């Protein structure tokens, strides 16, 4: 777990930096262009490549050195951040240039998440998989739980360019953490190749199967699995619609609230709303014996109710409370959907 702990630390720092940049760019685009579509374009450029490239990145993580993929992804994303910094040097940053930098950074960052999660298989025994996975989820949640409030406090002091510089610095720290783990594993493997080979045997078997299937074959196999199970198709469609609705709400929150609150207050509101994820995760633990369909229905119902309530309240803190309910409901639906998917596939 020592090596996993170092990777988790790097992931936490990097996630925090990513959240700082995302918050700062959204605020600047709204202030500069005055439209929700400008903020939406930046968010789309930042997250769409990660989602679209995730299957291919996962296939690559099964075939190549995962730590090297993480180093390339984190170091390469600095290039995109440099493009964004160049755009922000203008008094009126061009939307196209900012989006281009976000796309470049996001495309390279897409390599890191699947490789990081797959590294759990390499570095920990089977009985520690759940523990390591939980640590990774907690680290990735930093961009939602801590980054907005921190960005709201820092932005009046150092500006959005300062936030982007911090983000680039966190990428380099993550590269250093990953490189340290990679070097330590190579040294340990050279000193005791027998023990290292025994530890890596399960991962090598998985990679061998993936290499035989090929990246494209793995993607097509996953698609055929979804297409051949009516229950999976319905579940994917349902979660796609729910994710789309939540994405629309997230994009519109800042344009709705920024005219009424300060940047620091906006960051605090987002952080308070995101803490609902911790409550939702606790509810999943308490309801661990509930049927997955019950979890899915409860999560989607809570999310839908919260979204309906958003425009009915009196002000910013009402929106924060509705956001809290939305994030608290998400772990329920995600846990239910994951169990249903595993049941269909297995």
Residue map of PLM features:
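Alpha-helical transmembrane-bundle signature of multi-pass membrane transport and export proteins
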Residues: 1-346
């Amino acid at each position: 777990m020592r090596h996993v702990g170092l990777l988790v630390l790097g992931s936490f720092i990097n996630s925090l930096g990513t959240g700082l940049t995302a918050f700062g760019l959204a605020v600047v685009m709204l202030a500069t262009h005055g439209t929700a579509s400008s903020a939406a374009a930046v968010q789309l450029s930042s997250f769409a490549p990660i989602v679209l490239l995730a299957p291919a990145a996962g296939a690559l993580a099964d075939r190549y050195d995962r730590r090297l993929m993480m180093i390339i992804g984190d170091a390469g994303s600095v290039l995109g951040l440099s493009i964004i910094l160049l755009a922000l040097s203008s008094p009126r940053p061009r939307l196209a240039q900012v989006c281009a930098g976000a796309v470049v950074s996001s495309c390279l960052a897409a390599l890191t998440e699947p490789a990081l999660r797959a590294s759990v298989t390499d570095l920990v025994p089977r009985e520690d998989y759940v523990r390591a996975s939980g640590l990774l989820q907690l680290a990735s949640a930093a961009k939602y739980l801590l980054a907005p409030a921190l960005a709201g406090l820092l932005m009046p002091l150092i500006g959005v360019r300062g936030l982007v510089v911090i983000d680039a610095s966190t990428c380099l720290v993550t590269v250093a953490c990953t490189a340290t783990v990679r070097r330590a594993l190579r040294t340990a493997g050279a000193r005791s190749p027998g023990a290292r080979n025994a530890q890596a045997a399960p991962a090598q078997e998985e990679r061998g199967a993936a290499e035989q299937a090929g990246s494209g074959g793995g993607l097509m196999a996953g698609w055929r699995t979804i297409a051949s199970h009516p229950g999976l198709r319905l579940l994917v469609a349902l979660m796609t619609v729910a994710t789309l609705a939540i994405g629309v709400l997230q994009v519109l929150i800042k344009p709705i609230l920024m005219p009424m609150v300060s940047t620091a207050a906006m960051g605090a509101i987002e952080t308070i709303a995101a803490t609902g994820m911790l409550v939702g995760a606790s509810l999943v633990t308490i309801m661990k014996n509930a049927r997955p369909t019950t979890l899915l229905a409860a999560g989607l119902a809570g999310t839908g109710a919260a979204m309906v309530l958003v425009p009915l309240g009196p002000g910013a803190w009402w929106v924060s409370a509705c956001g809290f309910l939305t994030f608290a409901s998400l772990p329920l639906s995600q846990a239910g959907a994951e169990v249903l998917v595993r049941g269909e596939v297995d």
